């Protein structure tokens, strides 16, 4: 991927003395080995709570941090105390990318640390160690069959690879944003929300259509219709009153040339399906706006 390992920071579970759940030293040691392979002598720090992290900050050389269950424990109920009876659960280890100390708003968030809500660190991955079960008496016991559940944010990892906090700066979205700027004559920086929604929704619409889904008023087809129509409404906010999907969809398609054969077979049908929906909705919009204009001219205020 090309991410600088010096900008990677990880967190582990500090343990719960009350419930007899040990500190996740094993994960910390494994992380030290991983960092060492990258030429980094990763020091370990015990933080505890996010509030304590905001007071302490991080020290030079620290890359591995122990936090409490509010940060590094997974269950349906959140923390250790609120884990539902009978549920599987366990500690987790999260991976963060560092965008630089200058990104932290100390006045609002305190000193920077991985679990801060400030802009310095962004979580890009998480390993949940499903190794416990909560018993009827509230205690915890080890599961007979344990597993590791990894989750990684593809777009966040891509953003970290280009050192950008904005996933819409990645190659998956940037061509779409640039085309929207060209069509609308407006800049992304002043219209981030509308352009992000358009790019995100049209990508989703493309992928749904590529699997054979068509816009309708029922179930999945209705979800597809809503995506397309919301993108068009946001385009209206940008002053784009003409059909524009034919300029955007081919840019999305370029990112998915390696899709499975079953999807590739239907891909050629995507653009006609989406543009038909666009044209139909624009006609509906025009009729609706025309009626609203008539009502306004009649003096009807809505009060």
Locate the predicted segments by residue:
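Structured aminoacyl-transfer and RNA-binding surfaces used for tRNA recognition/handling
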Residues: 1-261, 271, 275-300
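Conserved catalytic-core motifs characterized by acidic clusters
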Residues: 265
């Amino acid at each position: 991927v090309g991410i600088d390992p010096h900008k990677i920071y990880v967190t582990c579970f500090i343990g719960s003395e009350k419930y007899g759940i040990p500190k996740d030293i094993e994960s910390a040691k494994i992380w030290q080995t991983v960092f060492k392979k990258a030429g980094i002598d990763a020091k370990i720090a015990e933080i505890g709570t996010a509030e304590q992290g905001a007071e302490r900050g991080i020290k030079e050389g620290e890359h591995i941090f122990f936090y409490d269950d509010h940060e590094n424990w997974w269950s349906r109920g959140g923390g250790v105390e609120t884990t539902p009876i009978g549920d599987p659960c366990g500690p987790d280890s999260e991976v963060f990318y560092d965008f630089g100390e200058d990104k932290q708003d100390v006045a609002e968030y305190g000193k920077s640390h991985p679990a801060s809500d400030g802009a310095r660190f962004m979580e890009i991955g998480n390993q949940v160690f499903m190794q416990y079960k909560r018993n009827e008496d509230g205690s915890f016991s080890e599961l007979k069959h344990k597993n590791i559940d990894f989750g990684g944010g593809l777009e966040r990892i891509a953003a970290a690879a280009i050192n950008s906090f904005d996933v819409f700066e990645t190659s998956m979205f940037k061509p779409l944003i640039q085309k929207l700027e060209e069509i609308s004559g407006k800049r992304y920086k002043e219209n981030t929300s509308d352009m992000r929604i358009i790019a995100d929704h049209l990508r989703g619409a493309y992928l749904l259509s590529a699997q054979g889904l068509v816009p309708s008023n029922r179930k999945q087809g209705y979800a597809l219709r809503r995506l397309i129509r919301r993108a068009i409404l946001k385009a209206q906010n940008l002053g784009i009153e003409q059909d524009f999907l034919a300029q955007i969809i081919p840019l999305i398609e370029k990112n998915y040339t390696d899709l499975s054969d079953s999807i590739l077979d239907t891909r050629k049908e995507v653009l006609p399906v989406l543009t038909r929906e666009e044209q139909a909705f624009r006609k509906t919009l025009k009729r609706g706006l025309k009626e609203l204009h008539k009502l306004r001219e009649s003096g009807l205020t809505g009060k």
